Amino acid sequence: MTEEHNIPKVYDPASVEKKWYEFWEKNRYFHAEPEPGKKPFSIVIPPPNITGKLHMGHALDNTLQDILIRWHRMMGDNTLWMPGYDHAGLATQIKVEEVLKKEEGKTRFDLGREEFVKRVWAWKEEYGDRIINQLKCLGISCDWERKRFTMDEGCSRAVRETFVSLFEKGLIYKGTRITNWCVNCHTALSDIEVEHEDTLGHLWYVRYPVVGEEDTYLTIATTRPETIPGDTAVAVNPEDERYAKLIGKTLRLPILNREIPVIADSYVDTKFGTGAVKITPSHDPNDYEMGLRHNLPEIVVIGKDGVMTEEAGPFAGLERYECRKQIVARLKEEGCLVKIEEHSHAVGHCQRCHNIVEPLVSTQWFVKMQPLVKAAVDCVTDGRTQFVPERFTKNYTGWMENIHDWCISRQIWWGHRIPVWYCDDCGEMSASRTDLEKCPKCGSTHIHQDEDALDTWFSSALWPFSTMGWPDNTELLKQFYPTSVLVTGYDIIFFWVARMLIMGMEFMKEIPFEKVFIHGLVRDSQGRKMSKSLGNGIDPLEVIEKYGADTLRFMLITGNTPGNDMRFYWERVEGTRNFANKIWNASRFALMNMEGYDKDAELAPYTLADKWILSRLQDTVKDVTGLLERFELGEAGRAIYDFIWSEVCDWYIEIAKPRLYNKEAAAERATAQHVLATVLVSAMKLLHPYMPFITEEIYQCLPHEAESIMISKWPVADESLVDPEAERGMNAIMDSIKAIRNMRAEVNANPGKKIPAIMLVSEDLREVVAHNDSYIKLLGGIDNLELRQLNGEKPENAMAAVVTGIEVYLPLAGLIDVEKETQRLSKELAAMEKDLQRAGGKLNNAGFLAKAPEDVIAKERAKYEELSGKIEAVKKRMAYLAELK
């Protein structure tokens, strides 16, 4: 090794990251080509929206994938990570509409469909790559040469093929039924695009007069009085004896005075409200189903804009919630309002804009799901596709067993326009894989295409195979489909995972992925979801700019367990930054002491420390590889951390220093250099998937075999180097050194002062301790070490500690000034007791507890507990010193 291999004193992530990412891309290390006979490993990226900006969820999700990809690349697999992004129909349309309104004061309707769609494409070209470039800042190693877009030519062709194929099989149909409607986004939504939130509202109890029976009423309870004008019946349970005589009678609708029947239906819950419910088939999904069963008329009283229709009579033209207020006022005036109760219930909100969803009867396109789900459920229950953690299998199968038809049409302009044409002359409806110019039935050119666009998730459901060239049978599909693993959050199992399994089994007749690796959400330090409204979001790019991408990546993964949410703590970011600095400094030290290193030099026999660290390396390689195979990426990262920090840096390097510094003993120095280089190179390889930049920088400076660490070979354990005896002996010595350090700290002894020690050692450890007592002297600050038999004479007036097979004694003579140390501790105790009294006073103050924020009270309690613990420790130390006087 020469001077050029030295690395700077301080690690600068920004310059290192830019340099190596450009190097990797230039050398096309991310790129994959089909290679028959070579083991494939493939992942398709969950495509981020083109409107997207990198957030912590993206950072976690993509780092998990990158670790798996980099690991398998080093394992020698033919590794493809297919990147791309999603057109995000509704989200993108809303974004461009906002820009249009702000910059030009126009709406999409002012531009017209064709011009507006052109504007969206222009916006996509300008901003679409933003999140891709942000992912590159994170170190993501996708095959960017294969970047796809859900509306590119190939994906659009796949969407057309899928739609027409399902249409021809009768699995896509156009129907009129009740759907979720967003009055703000002006489009239908599928069931899973509606977020149900527990909301504190009211139950209004309203009495409906019985026709022909004076002073006889049937009282109902409703959460939506604004829909009363759309009532076409009142329902009771046929088993409810309270209302048996009223079944079949007629009621008069309050305010509008229209007559409606009393019907019996077992769906009615006798315990809800009064046990009698109003039925509004056009504005409630359950009422709609009941209306079909009883052939009830459907009266639409709320329009698609959330405004009351003409059918609402005197309330026409009112916004739906203003109508609610006025109807309640009229009910009071007419003496029909019995009472109002507070009532908590789940209210559906649009996932995109968060407005309250309105159930409305409309004509939409649907996919029949029941004929498609069996194959998608079977492939999971028989183990062809496995969820990790396994508990999510139940979530998936449970939802699939109760699935409803999928509403796939959206009343928007940006997206895959539904490939159906209508003939204005003969009325024929035709689905086509290519754009039609004339009616296939009558030949008329008077045709028009359906105005609606497909749900964004329709194209996303085809992602694992549309990105690889389907419907053509490409070489890419042959090599890389089914993909190896899908990495995604539990929040889109139903939106995306289920639909990919359905489409994969239907069109490829094969699973889309072998494993589904589920992770949780990244929450703030208080466990809250990060959001704009709370102002608690943390920008990953800011973390990268300040601490480096490696720090963010390693912190996210080691703080994560499969399937569970994690909390973001700045303290953990700083802790990981310290780990990066530790690695850097250790590597810098090693390189500074590699002068004259020759890998072919004659070596001296391995020392105990050499044997131990090489054995521990093999153990770590096996542990990390096994954990990665089980998708326990956080545990694997922590195992690497412990090995590098707690074993290589804290112990081996410190023990190796005398040999590295001694240029006179060439063979011994060469051996220490060889072992340290071997261990560091292997450690960097293990760490590379997690921290790709710093490991590449260090690898390039160390003796190495590949032109880049990312295409080097993953370490394989060498069983000939596994040495349990060396590990046992070294553990005994390390435990002894820790005991010495703890005893010195306990009495506040000068850490730089050399002291004598006596060790009583068991027969089976005596030889190893005797031959390696230099380690104890070096790291324990011992100048004279006396070894005795374990059952031999125990020294008096000495501190003692017991570890496995060894008793360690430190004679007190000259170790500390007992009187001086006692005085110091007395002052420390008095100050802490004063602070404890102050904290206790606050916690016993009712006013403080009533007025102070919860986090302030929690901090005060934590302070009180911490002080109590410290006081107890000081008292014990003083009691111990008192015994020594």
Describe the residue ranges of each PLM region.
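Non-catalytic terminal extensions that flank enzyme cores
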Residues: 1-56, 73, 79, 338, ...
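Residue patterns forming the tRNA-binding/recognition surfaces of aminoacyl-tRNA synthetases
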Residues: 5, 10, 19, 23-27, ...
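N-terminal catalytic cores of NTP/NDP-binding nucleotidyl/phosphoryl-transfer enzymes
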Residues: 35-96, 150, 159, 220-222, ...
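Short, solvent-exposed turn/loop segments enriched in Gly/Ser/Thr/Pro and often Arg
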Residues: 36-38, 46-47, 80-93, 147-155, ...
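Alpha-helical support elements that line or immediately flank enzyme active sites
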Residues: 58-60, 285-290, 499-507, 640
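Secondary-structure transition/capping motifs at alpha-helix termini
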Residues: 70-78, 99-109, 133, 137-142, ...
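Feature 926 captures the class I aminoacyl-tRNA synthetase adenylation module centered on the KMSKS loop
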Residues: 205, 398-458, 462, 506-549, ...
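Protease-associated
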Residues: 214-279, 283-289
